[in-house]
Amino acid sequence: MPLVALVFLAVNLAAIGVVARGSRTLWLLPNLALLTFAVLYLLPIFTRPISDSIFLPILTANISLALAALLFRGLPVAARRHKPPIITGNVFLLLGVLFCSIGVFAVYQSLVASGGLTSVLLDYGGRGYLAARVNGANSGILGVLAWASPFGLAMLLAAWLQQPGRYGVFSVFLVFFGLVMGGYFLLTVRHNAVATLLMLAAVVFRYRGFKLRSALLFALPLVAVFTVFQAVRVAGVGQLGLGSIINSTSQSAEHLEVTEYMIEKTRFDGYTGFSQMLDLPVFLVPRVFWPEKPRTSTLNRLYFPEQASVGSEKSPGIVAEGYVSWGYPGIIIVSFAFMGLLSFVQARFDRLKDPLAAALFAAVFVPYTYMGVRTGVFGKHLVPVIFIYLEYLVAMRLARLGLRLRPRAGNIRPD
């Protein structure tokens, strides 16, 4: 199996190289999905034995994603023409500060609700904090609001890249970056931290173009964040060290274990028929209007009912989600739908003429690219993407409003 995995890893890299041609951003979103899949599903095969029951679904998903990426790469993309930024002055800076403040408030309010700033890190450890935090009436909305800070950081970084001489803006960015990542570490939430770094990478690549040096600069903190956060969740901060990091990383195959368990159980219980798609309207309803709203996703209630009371989530990932929905055809459907959406978004991303708007548009969907492979394509994980997209629409609406008001202020400059 490791030899076959090595072959498919090479196929993944070849597909990434082919679809990246002709795109200033190397066709970022679909390629990020392929790379994430390789890291999460193919690389662990070299460190742990797995059965045929999970190996074949993984390869089916891998082939489907690669083929879909190649097929959808033919989407027409208009020529890019760069125009002056659509947002100028301090409006953009203020929006970034506003979104960062909302996200930071949500993260630290979650810490307070769980017993104190360091209670999750020192007292509970791992997933234990969910029992203390998730039963709060505002836990759901706080989790959604926490996604405001990554988009705010993307706005601040884009504002600085737009005018690199404004080091005051960069200083504000660094302050909020420290607060945001510090809060994520105290909560031991990996998804938010990894997605934040990926969003910032998308902004930099859109402004500066893809460079190997920049990619390595982002890859190193990504690896550090994922491994350290994983070690903290598995071993606890008291046992944190090089040995625990290496051990937890080499044995970190929870998504593979969950995938294997769900596939085996499905063969006895039957397919779910994409019932997880009902999660999206359910989780968009505030708990204040529906006190008995489920605390976990449909798939978790079906496959892990013993943990539903504390809201713990076992991430099925794209492979298990597709298989439990409709077997191997389900894997193909989910893979093609996921890659089709990413390719459509990427085509629009490359068509946007303004670099600032393009950078923010990419930042909206980068978290979904990572979470779709890691936690599932459909269901409640779409809620953060919808929230971030609403933030994007607010920013663009204010930009258009500013363009309408600018002629009245006499601020039009001749071309």
Locations of regions flagged by a protein language model:
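Membrane-interface helix-loop-helix junctions at transmembrane boundaries of multi-pass membrane enzymes
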Residues: 20-28, 156-172, 347-360
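N-terminal "leader" segments that precede or initiate the main folded domain
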Residues: 1-87, 170-174, 180, 200-205, ...
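Hydrophobic core segments of transmembrane alpha-helices in multi-pass, intramembrane catalytic enzymes
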Residues: 8, 58-65, 146-156, 190-203, ...
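Hydrophobic alpha-helical segments
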Residues: 155, 314-415
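Membrane-embedded catalytic interface detector for glycan/lipid assembly enzymes
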Residues: 76-210, 222-238
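Aromatic-rich transmembrane-lumenal/periplasmic boundary elements in polytopic membrane proteins
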Residues: 100-119, 214-296
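Interfacial juxtamembrane loops and adjacent helix segments
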Residues: 279-319
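Hydrophobic alpha-helical transmembrane segments
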Residues: 4-11, 94-105, 142-154, 320, ...
